[in-house]
């Protein structure tokens, strides 16, 4: 498989390539083989973090920051997870955005758990729980256009959705969760 990275920060190029390889490997082990021959991570003028397409993700070049590599890794892992959740397993992203975004966000937690240990995954879950504490009555099962604003959308679709998958995992256990 060919992994390409394009960015203007030469110091981070090797790390970005490693993150891309690690995320493809981890997600292939968890969800099934990556179905394409190539994968590209491209830095771009993109104000919302990242965007996914089959075999290609665009990452906001402002995230290529040596002082905060965690956020860069998080966004690359998240956008890479979209290669499964939306690209391989499609859904209606407008009517049911929680399906791919919640799975993708939870997959990002799984990436960090697999790469750095369960404690890191648990910290990410705790952060998500704190972020959503005051939004617990909001429904995640709405169309994209039904959210009040981008913060409401993000907290519900990404964060609460990921927490819902975490609750399922806790209820059924790892063996059943990852087998299904």
Positions of predicted regions on the chain:
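Alpha-helix C-capping/helix-to-loop hinge sites
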Residues: 87, 168-171
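Short, intrinsically disordered, charge-balanced linker/junction segments flanking boundaries
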Residues: 174-180
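Acidic/His/Gly-enriched intrinsically disordered linker/tail segments
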Residues: 97, 101-163, 170-171
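Juxtacatalytic substrate-recognition/specificity segment
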Residues: 1-83, 87-96, 107, 147-151
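Glycine-rich, acidic and aromatic/proline-enriched surface loops and short helix-turn segments
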Residues: 29-33, 46-48, 130-134, 170, ...
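Positions in alpha-helical segments
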Residues: 70, 163-166, 179
């Amino acid at each position: 498989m060919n992994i390409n990275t394009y960015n203007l920060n030469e110091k981070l190029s090797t790390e970005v390539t490693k993150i891309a390889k690690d995320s493809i490997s981890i997600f292939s082990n968890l969800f099934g083989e990556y179905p394409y021959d190539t994968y590209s991570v491209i830095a771009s003028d993109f104000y919302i973090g990242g965007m996914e397409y089959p075999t290609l993700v665009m990452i906001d070049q402002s995230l290529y920051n040596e002082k905060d590599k965690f956020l860069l890794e998080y966004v690359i892992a998240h956008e890479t997870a979209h290669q499964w959740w939306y690209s391989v397993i499609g859904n209606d992203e407008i009517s049911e955005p929680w399906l791919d975004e919640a799975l993708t966000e939870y997959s990002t937690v799984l990436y960090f758990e697999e790469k750095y240990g369960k404690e890191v995954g648990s910290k990410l879950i705790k952060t998500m729980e704190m972020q959503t504490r005051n939004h617990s009555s909001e429904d995640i099962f709405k169309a994209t256009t039904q959210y009040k604003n981008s913060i409401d959308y993000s907290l519900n679709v990404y964060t609460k959705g990921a927490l819902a998958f975490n609750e399922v995992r806790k209820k059924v256990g790892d063996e059943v969760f990852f087998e299904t």
